[in-house]
Each structure stands twice: as structure tokens, then as C-alpha cells.
Design a protein with these regions (language model features):
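Helicase motor core with emphasis on the C-terminal RecA-like subdomain
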Residues: 3-335, 339
Length: 339
């Protein structure tokens, strides 16, 4: 949008540094091509522009670097040569699989995985075993409890979330509860699956109302903000979510991640596992919850790939002309061009 302004050159010609975070989410699709074209335009205005790409889940780092900084501008200084910097921090990653009591009776088809609901409930309970009941009048701003032990409740629950947090046939639990143990993220692959699991957890444990939440892209910003504040403050026991919490989150209270169904790739598995133990020296942990028997095989393959350090490569699309046309229109709007 900024590049489409008629005065784009005036405002952006002096940009010195561009940081592209989570480059793995862009490099393999047309959004990544748009980023490449935008960076090329900025480099044309300022040949000394520095570009940094950041990623923790790419199997083909040299290719990803060459895609982000493909060629040097004609007037670029020698020190602008692309450089690959890799961290040497050993990050412990623990992968477990939640198995049914009788594997031979496990379903061969399905995508919800609700047959493992009792085991999931036990896992969440074990991760956050202590709850302290608070009076609603104690609610403050969602900040973490003070070091001296005074407790704070989460920020006021938005009206929409208060309705969805009420289990069928029952009222929402009175008061706010402060989760003293670690929080759990339950990742699903679709919004409908997330909503079904959220409702199933409330039906199984009505007393958890107000301490578990739902997070996906169709919810309002107010609701998502409340959930994220509760995670940061450590006031939520569990959050059922989609890819809306894959990136850009740093919730230290999260100690456990459950993946309902297939993660659809080793890179995404690593990304979601990293939501737990999100600090140097801490162990990231993820538990795979298969929805049918074939996913048991996939879980075993994912564990083996992680043990061998293998992550999928991501390749940029070849000659997406529609993106080029869109970029040319952007240039035309942003001050015009000379064919």
C-alpha cells in the first residue's frame, strides 16, 4: 500500500533496513514473490538497503537466502554480499504421541479425534493442576501476578467470549480462576475442528469455563486480544486454536502443545512445538493426538525426521505473471513508470 502512493519514493527512499520475519511462511507462495518485488523497488531507490530474513524452520537455507536477496544492485557496496548466519544454540524438542488404550480398535478414518478426549483432558489437567478461585471484583488488567504472591485475574471477558465459554445446559462458572500451572495450546487444522474441540472440552469439564478459550481468525480482535492477554498473564488453562497462533507469539506460561490430527509437515510441527518452552535453555514439547490409525504412521515418520534433523524445503513459485502485473500496477500508481 505504501508503494502505491504517488509520493512513495519521497517517503521510502531513505529506508536503511528491512527485516522479513518468518520468511518460511512467504518464500513458498506468491506473497513471497510480492515481497521480492517490493524489496527490488526499494533497493533501486537505495542501493545500500540492508535486508534481513529470519526463519527457524527452513530446510533449504541457501536457496531461501538467494530468493530473498537474489542479486546485488549495480551500485551496491562490496560488503552487501548476502551472508547466511545460523544460530548454534541447542534447542531441546520433545515429541510424544497420545495413544488410545487399544490401538487395534482405533478408527481407520475420521478427522476430529474426539475418541481421545479423556486422555487430552488428563493431559491438560496434569499440565495445570492448581487453580485459585478469585472474586470477579478482583479483575484487573491481565498482568502477571506480582512476585510476592498477590493474585490477579485476567482482563474482563468480552461479551462474545463469555457466551461461547458457557457449556451447553449450564451457566458460566462464577468468578475468575487463575491458572497457577502451565498453559496448554491445542492446535487444530480447521476452525470448525477448533470449535468442536472447544465445546467438547467444556462439556467434559464444565468447571473449566472461564479458564479455557478459543482462538482463530474469524473471532473479533477484541476476543483474540483477551485470549492472548490471558496466555501472557498465565490466567488460562488451555486455548484451542488454529494457525492463528502459529507465528509471532511469545507466551512463556505455555508449557505444553497438543496437535490434534496431522501437522501437515515437519516444519509446521517444529513451529508449533516452539510455542512451548519459548525461552533459551527450556525444552519445547509437543504431543501428537492422531485422529485415525494412518496418522499413527505419520507421527512415527515425523519423529524420525526430527531426530535426523530433516525439514522440508520451500521453493518460490516460478514466473507468477499475475503477481508481476499487480506489481506493475502498483508502480504505475506510485509515481508512474517508463516502459
Amino acid at each position: 500500500l505504501l508503494l502505491a502512493r504517488a509520493d512513495a519514493h519521497e517517503h521510502l527512499a531513505h529506508v536503511q533496513l528491512v527485516v522479513v520475519d518468518e520468511w518460511h511462511e512467504l518464500v513458498g507462495n506468491k506473497r513471497g514473490v510480492q515481497v521480492q518485488l517490493a524489496l527490488a523497488r526499494l533497493s533501486g531507490w537505495n542501493p545500500r538497503l540492508q535486508v534481513w530474513g529470519m526463519s527457524a524452520t527452513l530446510g533449504n537455507l541457501p536457496e531461501a537466502l538467494a530468493t530473498l536477496v537474489p542479486t546485488l544492485p549495480p551500485r551496491a557496496p562490496r560488503r552487501a554480499k548476502p551472508l547466511l548466519v545460523q544460530g548454534r544454540i541447542d534447542k531441546a524438542l520433545q515429541v510424544q504421541v497420545l495413544l488410545p488404550e487399544r490401538v487395534e480398535r482405533f478408527a481407520w478414518a475420521g478427522h476430529m479425534g474426539l475418541s481421545l478426549l479423556p486422555q487430552v483432558v488428563q493431559s491438560i489437567e496434569a499440565n495445570a493442576s492448581t487453580l485459585v478461585l478469585q472474586h470477579p471484583s478482583d479483575a484487573e488488567d491481565g498482568t502477571p501476578p506480582p512476585a510476592h504472591g498477590a493474585r490477579r485475574s485476567p482482563p474482563p471477558i468480552p461479551q462474545v467470549l463469555a457466551r461461547t465459554a458457557t457449556p451447553r445446559g449450564g451457566a458460566m462458572a462464577s468468578g475468575n480462576r487463575h491458572a497457577r500451572g502451565g498453559a496448554t495450546l491445542l492446535f487444530t487444522n480447521t476452525r470448525s475442528q477448533a470449535e468442536r474441540w472447544y465445546q467438547a472440552l467444556l462439556e467434559a469439564r464444565p468447571d473449566w469455563a472461564g479458564t479455557i478459550a478459543l482462538h482463530h481468525g474469524s473471532l473479533s480482535g477484541e476476543v483474540r486480544g483477551w485470549v492472548e492477554a490471558g496466555l501472557k498473564a498465565g490466567t488460562l488453562k488451555a486455548v484451542v486454536c488454529t494457525s492463528s497462533l502459529d507465528l509471532g507469539v511469545d507466551f512463556l506460561p505455555v508449557e505444553q502443545v497438543l496437535q490434534i490430527g496431522s501437522a501437515k509437515g515437519v516444519a509446521r510441527l517444529v513451529q508449533r512445538a516452539g510455542r512451548s518452552g519459548h525461552a533459551p535453555g527450556r525444552t519445547s514439547s509437543i504431543t501428537l493426538v492422531p485422529t485415525h490409525s494412518l496418522e499413527l504412521v505419520e507421527a512415527a515418520a515425523a519423529r524420525q525426521a526430527l531426530a535426523e534433523g530433516r525439514i522440508e524445503d520451500r521453493h518460490t513459485p516460478r514466473a507468477p505473471l499475475d503477481v508481476l502485473v499487480q506489481h506493475l500496477v502498483t508502480i504505475a500508481l506510485g509515481g508512474g513508470l517508463v516502459p
